[in-house]
Curated annotation (Swiss-Prot):
NCBIfam families on file: PRK00881.1, purH
Domain notes: The IMP cyclohydrolase activity resides in the N-terminal region.
Gene3D superfamilies (UniProt xref): 3.40.140.20, Methylglyoxal synthase-like domain
A cellular component term, taken from the record's GO annotations: cytosol
Its EC number(s): 2.1.2.3, 3.5.4.10
Similarity comment: family membership: Belongs to the PurH family.
Keyword annotations from UniProtKB, A to Z: Hydrolase, Multifunctional enzyme, Purine biosynthesis, Transferase
GO BP term, example: 'de novo' IMP biosynthetic process
Protein name, entry field: Bifunctional purine biosynthesis protein PurH
Amino acid sequence: MAPFALLSVSDKNGVVALAEALHRTHGYALLSSGGTAKVLEDAGLPVTRMSEHNGAPEILGGRVKTLHPRVHGGILAKRGDAAHQADLEQQGIPAIDLVVVNLYPFRETVARADVTWDQAIENIDIGGPAMVRAAAKNHADVAVLTSPDQYSSVLAAMAESAGRVPADLCRQLALEAFQHTAAYDTAISRWMAGEVELVSSPWLEAVPLRQTLRYGENPHQKARWFSHPRQGWGGAIQLQGKELSTNNLLDLEAALATVREFGYGPNAVGPAAVVVKHTNPCGVAVGPVVASALTRALDADRVSAFGGIVAINGPVEAAAARELTGLFLECVVAPSFSPEAREILAAKANLRLLELSPDAIAAAGPDHVRSILGGLLVQDLDDQVMTPDQWTLATKRPPTAQEKQDLEFAWRLVRHVRSNAIVVARDGQSLGVGAGQMNRVGSARIALEAAAEKAKGAVLASDGFFPFDDTVRLAASHGITAVIHPGGSLRDGESVKACDELGLAMLLTGRRHFLH
């Protein structure tokens, strides 16, 4: 008897091509229902309708289609169990070898502003999860596919295994199936809780395991990466290089967040590059082309850039690739790499190259999630953009046009530096970064010493207010001509007075940007 494949999907992307390969290449008989059956029939494929297979029609307006012993018996029967096989033979039930099911679009339905309670309830799938769970439970004998993303890899595996799905892949598919149904049920419970004002977070849904990482922050720590496919870093494509580590991903996240201040991909306002070490930017710059922006970012602090992570907001071409080969780097992320760039960078076999599309970034959602002992903290991303017309002049002297441009650049950077954070910048390039000190003047001292002689004529940004006038006085002693900070200290007046005395311009943003 030909093997049986059951197909019943809400997301019909790729289902015709999958069914054609199953039937015409691997000899599967096709069992289907409702809209999926019609799509397959319209494509000229022979399909046994579920009502014909079960000997019973769909009832209750389609609420009951697949909840039948001929379906679940065929899925759950253990092939090596004589009693199970006897039951199938006695009832005339064919075994079902492959189940392709994805569920009613509940999340998409409840995301609509005009959705009613009854509409949402009707989009709670019952038969689909039952088939998925049954197939996942019996993964020793049945393969279960819950996403179009799985189709090509499963067909490739079948092509190498005489039309069968390998056992190790069946087990992985079962894991993903249980994750799929768990996330689905969590979405329903979250929605129902929201109706009674017990709103939760989407991050409390089950998030599938993407991969086991090389190690955690240190080699003695084990680590795993959980991520939704196609969302954020889950949608990144690693083109070459070693396996990613926890630190790689944390640094990549910091680098990407910083470079996105200048737009990303088609939305880039101009070429920009960022170099990160230990989640802090050590070099940030803009330029007329990607290669020049990258060179300027590396030149900002080549000592710290060694072993760093680079993010670029535009396509990487050959000139930028050659710049990247000039020192040891861990990872590079960009929207794309040209064939010439990839050929050049292939010489650095251990360098991890990641392509991350703007669509994957957009799909990640607005939440910033951190863990604490036994729980999660979920907050909005700190990604609201302030424009210079929202800032307040605090000093007698306004900044010059060049100073104002430099202050805007520095302000974009400082919120991506660990608090207490100070950035010294000029002409679209960071010159010194002071991060993570327990007092603000300590961070300022680090940033100014890093900038050295380049601090003369540069500007300084602070992620929090100046509690005393010591920071602006230190800045002036190094040649800083303008500063920007949120303001809000009870002693703001002292810092303003010091700036007026020393000839500095000061802008107040009214918004703090702590980063822990």
